A protein has these predicted regions:
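Short, charged, surface-exposed hinge/linker loops at domain edges
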Residues: 1-13, 47-78
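Short, positively charged
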Residues: 9, 15, 19-21, 39
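Short aromatic-glycine-(Arg/Gly/Cys) micro-motifs in beta-strand/loop hairpins
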Residues: 16-32
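A short, exposed loop/beta-hairpin motif centered on an aromatic-Gly-Thr core
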Residues: 33-44
Length: 78
């Protein structure tokens, strides 16, 4: 398993919120500073976030930047 695969499979928190001003959804990983994307639908935002996470992690590995560990807290809203 590659170093990238190890990081991609870690349980990073994904937050997806509706964009009330522009429409669509914004998705981001709070542990991965600057790893943010959007999509016209919830599913598109999630898929874009998965791709963005892999690109973000790849850039960090290539540049020798320290990658934070996932937050172990459970996040939920009612």
């Amino acid at each position: 398993m590659s170093k990238l695969d190890e990081y991609v499979n870690l349980p990073y928190t994904l937050i997806v919120i509706p964009d009330l001003e522009e429409g669509g959804f914004t998705a981001y990983f709070p542990e991965l500073q600057g790893c943010i994307t959007c999509g016209e639908s919830y599913a598109e935002a999630v898929n874009n976030a998965i791709e963005a996470k892999e690109e973000w992690l790849t850039a960090c590995i290539e540049d020798g930047i320290n990658i934070p560990k996932p937050n172990q807290q459970v996040v939920s809203w009612l």
